[in-house]
Amino acid sequence: MSFGTRHDPVRQVALMFVFDPRITALPIVGCEDRFPVRRVYCVGRNYVAHIREMKEGDERDPPFFFQKPADAVVAGGVDISYPPQTDDFQFEAELVVAIGAEAVDISVERALDVVFGYAVGVDLTRRDRQRESFKTGLPWEVGKAFDQSAPCGAIHPVAGVGHRLTGAISLSVNGVERQRGDLNQMIWNTPEIIANLSKSYRLQAGDLIMTGTPAGVGPIVPGDRLIVSVEGLTPLAFSIVGKES
């Protein structure tokens, strides 16, 4: 499959903007080009053990999705500032799927055809704010969709690593392992996620999908060093620093 959108939004015309538009992009392993991020979709409650530790939802529930802004994505190696308005800042290790072609209501059988590659990511969460939103029934972007809330490693093209349907996923804080699972423990696997998501959204090249986290999520504080790994992919490492003034 040739990756790219059916209708290229980039035209060879002179455009003037009131300010330079910011493009969030991630490095690609083995390539000097970068992967421009269009949208970030996240799958909620996709590992049984995580559902049980959070005491929310049911493993028989259909998949549900939320989003983070594209500029919440931070490339590996960049320090993450402890965010404001929280006393319970938590990590969630995730496999990230990078979409390379358009998909609308695609079948499970064809879903992997639109995958450009895979990366390691973390869904950073203001857990106390998220729980407040659950209690009030208000939207929970404040707990999930804030600045620097989606650290992501370099993208490995499928041509180099194949499809990541099984393999260990883990996260350590200051050298102590806090999360460990296997991608085959997902309730909804990658092709099922893509097929379900494409029923509600027109997926396009540049989209990222964070596929859920295994059990073991927990708090982090300034000074902590996180290393996140998915078998066969480049690990993601970053440190938590003090709140921005």
Task: Indicate where each model-derived feature is located.
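Catalytic-pocket segment enriched in acidic/His residues
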Residues: V13-F35, N46, H50-E59, A119, ...
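Extended, compositionally biased flexible segments
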Residues: V13-V115
